[in-house]
A protein has these predicted regions:
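N-terminal accessory regions of nucleic-acid-interacting proteins
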Residues: 1-58, 138, 191, 205-230
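Conserved DEDDh/DEDDy metal-dependent 3′-5′ exonuclease domain
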Residues: 33-46, 53-60, 66-188, 192-199
């Protein structure tokens, strides 16, 4: 059994579970081993939704073409819904939002897990009038496990000592054909949401035994000290 760390009280310090950028970069890369189905036809979307509706839990994510100019904006290009074994990549920049996908996103009886999904919802509501139901945002969920980090890659690194590469994040998600690297990146992000949620619920996570649970500088303390001297 891992040893539970004893917290000490040090002025200007705070205990939290967090992984540094340097530590994360040194972890071995995670890879995707499931099936990937790219949906770029309306008929294929209907078939995919029939499979997805059989599941009790789905991983959710989206990808958007990056912007490099001030004032430039792109709508969501790719919407990922993952089961435990396969991920469906809906190219909504090509086929629009299929009604069957919208129905799943608005079904409170199908649990969907994502990370930092507020902005996704705003964009999808603006374009497709989405009213999301049945979602859990890991960004808020992990706080009850004393995990201070809120990005998917850092949460995954803390729990599994594996690194999810973000190398494809700024690639062109509106390209005519998605590369294999893009597909695997998108699929892994969605699957990782399920993996994290189920690990926390089924296996449990005692942050007091984590090697990433330790003292960090308390920014509130530092600010208070500065205010005292001014």
């Amino acid at each position: 059994m891992d040893k539970i760390k004893e917290e000490t009280t040090t002025p200007g310090k705070i205990w939290k579970t967090s992984i540094t950028k340097s530590e994360l970069s040194q972890l071995p890369a995670e890879s995707y081993h499931g099936n990937i189905i790219v949906i770029d036809r309306a008929e294929a979307a209907v078939e995919a939704c029939e499979i997805l509706r059989r599941e009790k839990i789905l991983g959710f994510d989206t990808e958007t073409r990056p912007t490099f100019k001030s004032g430039q904006h792109h709508n969501v290009a790719l919407l990922q819904l993952s089961t435990h074994t396969e991920c469906f990549l809906f190219r909504i920049n090509i086929i629009g939002m299929p009604k069957c996908v919208l129905d799943i996103l608005e079904d409170e009886h199908i649990l969907k897990i994502g990370v930092s999904i507020h902005d996704d919802f705003l964009n999808l509501h603006k374009c497709y009038k989405l009213e999301p139901k049945g979602f859990i945002d890991l960004q808020a969920y992990v706080k009850s496990y004393n995990i201070a980090d809120n990005s998917l890659s850092r949460i995954y690194g803390i729990l599994f000592d594996k690194r999810i590469s973000k190398g494809q994040r700024l690639s062109n998600w509106e390209t005519q054909v998605l590369t294999q690297c893009q597909q695997e990146y998108a699929a892994l992000d969605a699957l990782a949401c399920i993996t994290i949620y189920e690990y926390l619920n089924k296996d449990g996570f005692d942050y007091r035994t984590s090697k990433y649970y330790r003292e960090f500088d308390d920014p509130n303390y530092q600010q208070a000290q500065q205010e005292k001297t001014t």
